[in-house]
């Protein structure tokens, strides 16, 4: 087995994985940068004084890491200090542009630089992208190969084999990084030894299923899910010829790649067959060849290098096939037949043709799985089940009674003291709401932030024949589960499950949009309480398009364990000077959501422990917590955006969300995130024209998300590639 793996790797994989890095000469730092440092930085970071042991009086283009730190400090508003003279907005923008040019020109020595990492797209200041009208005409993305997503890899395996045994026996070779947010970036992943070993084993599993057969009634027959052409070649009485190998390779190419192999490829696979058949087992040799087709780069990566001669600006347009694959995997987890048919017929040659077919594909279904996938990664609500919590909790008004019962509810308890925590159901409800808004496809972002409707404890009953689906209850009470605990509808503020959905939120327990969905609130909480810091950071990064400094090494980010105080009171420790320079970007954005518990339940007051009363209560000699109500402070503030219409105090989460939804900046930042998801990279200053046009198209279409996607997928930045 190991010998065959080495043969496959040397014949098929190795030639495709060899890459050559190109580097450019580093330009000298220009006079403008030196002047800026001398004027605004050197007094505290020069020969006479080195605050933080940082010396900038001789900073040059060779000091790339130092320049990165300077850029981050200036971009985040941490330097110059407030008490020092501040550069004008125009000068600051110009300086950041110059630094970006120098840092980009410096290269990365094969390493992925910070500005290319997911969740670091905001390193490009918003003003550089939307501050002034950008000229269009030369947009392009870097030429690249992009590893398949886990879902797309499964789809590729499904094209190769229809056997049910395959899907359950494959190991995922292409797992994404375990971080929140948009994670499938082209430059982030590469082939390594463990990945290669998994791919080889998976290929063997797929081919075994393709070739699976048995002798029955004296005849060699295929098993369910096998490929007839391959099964015939596994017949013990058949001698496999070169012509059989050529036909089998062509069949595998058709299944996996929708391509015909070239003469050179056919010759290479014949040579591989001959090498493997030297031990006399020609059937096993053929299986190795079929595995090799599954292991070639085209089966596991998307190639985006462009075709033909480069234009005057060094751009090459994606070939029709490259474009068909790029469009397919932008909108789906598998190849979309319409795109490949259009490529075969020469109907992906112009931007107008691409726009027509993209619109047609988007209009055929309620929503593409990749469209919903964007919102899942953007809002980060789907991680709610990963936040471990007790599976039941006391009703706000019956918390002390619930604590006494300790979750034990005999049949004679006729009333509800608590409610169930069912995070998987909460995620389904939120996704149903997003799909509903996407189906309407108007003013999408505003509705996502401010809608007063929701789905509750929903399950879809699908009638495939009639192509309809109806809402039913996911959780239903019965004699075994109707003891002391309310159904999941309680979390949303309903007294009973609403039959007509999406239902309007009860006015006495209001909530707006995704940020007040229980799934989002739970996903942005801790095991036992709310997390204003995480919620505020999400708003700062995903809606305001700014960055939050990373937690310094050696700092223990903890608040006092004082359950007899409110969370806001306990968080006063973050106002300390050494903490506040980071927390000022997050806390006041997250604290208004104290309107809800960490289970996502609306509340009018905050329950805290009453130490004195708790000392007097016990159950079977075990102490019992007793709670008292404290006044709820729901105020907050938006700061440091540079937009006077956005900055300022808010009285509660509702005012906060409405102000964000009304903001032009928030809409533009949303467009930036959509760009990252569909392009698999962070935006750069060169993408300003693409982003501005996408934003205009979104506004002029009354907030159509489909129109926004069409704008991006028909932009020059999507259609053209440029060698770096």
Regions found by a protein language model. Name each.
Residues 98, 112, 123-244, 252, ...:
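Extended surface/linker regions that mediate inter-domain or inter-protein docking
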Residues 5-16:
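Bacterial N-terminal signal peptides
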Residues 234-239, 256, 273, 307-314, ...:
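Active-site-adjacent structural elements in folded domains
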Residues 20-230, 255, 259-271, 275, ...:
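Aromatic- and Gly/Pro-enriched helix-to-coil junctions and flexible linker segments
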Residues 21-93, 504-653, 657-661, 667, ...:
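Sequence context surrounding c-type heme c attachment/ligation sites in exported
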Residues 1-3:
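N-terminal secretory signal peptides that target proteins for export/translocation
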Residues 306-312, 391-394, 464, 595-600, ...:
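Short secondary-structure boundary/capping segments
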Residues 27, 31, 86-90, 239-247, ...:
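Soluble non-cytosolic domains of exported or imported proteins
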């Amino acid at each position: 087995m190991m010998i065959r793996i080495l043969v496959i790797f040397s014949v098929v994989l190795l030639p495709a994985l060899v890459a050559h890095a190109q580097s450019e000469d580093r330009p000298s730092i220009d006079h403008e940068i030196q002047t800026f440092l001398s004027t605004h930085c050197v007094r505290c970071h020069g020969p006479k004084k080195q605050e933080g042991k940082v010396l900038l009086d001789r900073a040059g283009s060779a000091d790339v890491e130092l320049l990165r730190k300077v850029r981050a400090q200036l971009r985040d508003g941490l330097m110059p200090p407030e008490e020092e003279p501040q550069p004008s907005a125009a000068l600051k923008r110009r300086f950041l542009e110059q630094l970006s040019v120098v840092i980009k020109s410096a290269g990365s020595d094969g390493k992925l630089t910070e500005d290319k990492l997911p969740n670091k797209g905001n390193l490009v200041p918003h003003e550089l992208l939307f501050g002034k009208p950008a000229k269009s005409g030369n947009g392009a993305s870097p030429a690249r190969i992009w590893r398949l997503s886990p879902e797309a890899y499964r789809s590729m395996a499904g094209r190769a084999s229809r056997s049910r045994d395959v899907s359950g026996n494959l190991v995922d070779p292409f797992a994404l990084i375990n971080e929140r947010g948009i994670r499938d970036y082209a430059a982030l992943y590469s082939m390594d030894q463990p990945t290669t070993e998994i791919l080889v084993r998976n290929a063997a599993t797929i081919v075994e299923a393709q070739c699976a057969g048995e002798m029955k009634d004296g005849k060699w027959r295929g098993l369910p899910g096998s490929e007839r052409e391959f099964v015939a070649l596994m017949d013990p009485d058949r001698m496999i010829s070169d012509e059989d190998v050529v036909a089998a390779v062509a069949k595998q190419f058709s299944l996996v790649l929708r391509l015909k192999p070239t003469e050179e490829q056919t010759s290479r696979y014949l040579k591989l067959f001959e090498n493997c058949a030297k031990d006399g087992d020609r059937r096993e040799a053929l299986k190795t060849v079929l595995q090799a087709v599954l292991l070639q780069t085209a089966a596991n990566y998307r190639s985006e290098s462009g075709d033909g001669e480069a234009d005057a600006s060094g751009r090459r347009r994606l070939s029709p096939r490259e474009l068909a694959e790029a469009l397919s995997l932008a909108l789906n987890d598998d190849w979309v037949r319409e795109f490949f048919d259009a490529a075969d017929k020469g109907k992906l040659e112009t931007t107008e043709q691409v726009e027509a077919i993209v619109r047609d594909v988007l209009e055929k279904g309620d929503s593409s799985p990749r469209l919903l996938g964007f919102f899942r990664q953007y809002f980060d609500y789907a991680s709610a089940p990963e936040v471990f919590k007790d599976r039941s909790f006391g009703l706000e008004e019956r918390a002390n009674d619930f604590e006494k019962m300790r979750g034990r509810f005999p049949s004679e308890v006729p009333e509800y003291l608590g409610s169930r925590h069912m995070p998987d159901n909460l995620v389904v409800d939120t996704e149903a709401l997003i799909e509903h808004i996407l189906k309407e496809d108007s003013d999408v972002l505003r509705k996502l932030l401010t809608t007063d409707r929701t789905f509750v404890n929903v399950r879809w009953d699908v009638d495939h024949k009639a192509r309809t689906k109806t809402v039913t209850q996911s959780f239903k009470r019965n004699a075994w589960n109707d003891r002391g605990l309310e159904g999941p509808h309680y979390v949303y503020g309903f007294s009973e499950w609403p039959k007509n959905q999406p239902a309007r939120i009860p006015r006495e327990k209001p909530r707006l949009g995704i940020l007040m969905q229980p799934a989002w609130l739970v996903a942005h909480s801790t095991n036992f309480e709310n997390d204003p810091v995480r919620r505020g950071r999400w708003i700062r990064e995903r809606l305001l398009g700014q960055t939050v400094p990373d937690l310094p090494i050696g700092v223990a980010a903890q608040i006092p364990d004082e359950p007899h105080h409110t969370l806001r009171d306990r968080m006063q420790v973050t106002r300390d000077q050494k903490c506040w320079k980071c927390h000022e970007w997050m806390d006041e954005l997250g604290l208004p959501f104290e309107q809800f518990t960490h289970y996502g339940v609306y509340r009018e007051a905050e329950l805290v422990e009453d130490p004195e009363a708790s000392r007097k209560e016990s159950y079977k000699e075990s102490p019992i917590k007793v709670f008292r109500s404290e006044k709820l402070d729901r105020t907050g503030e938006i700061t440091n955006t540079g937009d006077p219409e956005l900055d300022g105090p808010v009285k509660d989460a509702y005012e906060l969300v409405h102000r964000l939804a009304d903001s032009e900046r928030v809409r533009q930042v949303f467009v930036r995130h959509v760009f990252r998801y569909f392009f698999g990279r962070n935006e750069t200053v060169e993408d300003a024209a693409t982003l501005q046009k996408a934003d205009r198209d979104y506004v002029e279409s009354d907030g159509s998300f489909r129109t926004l996607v069409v704008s991006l997928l028909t932009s020059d930045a999507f259609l053209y590639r440029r060698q770096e």
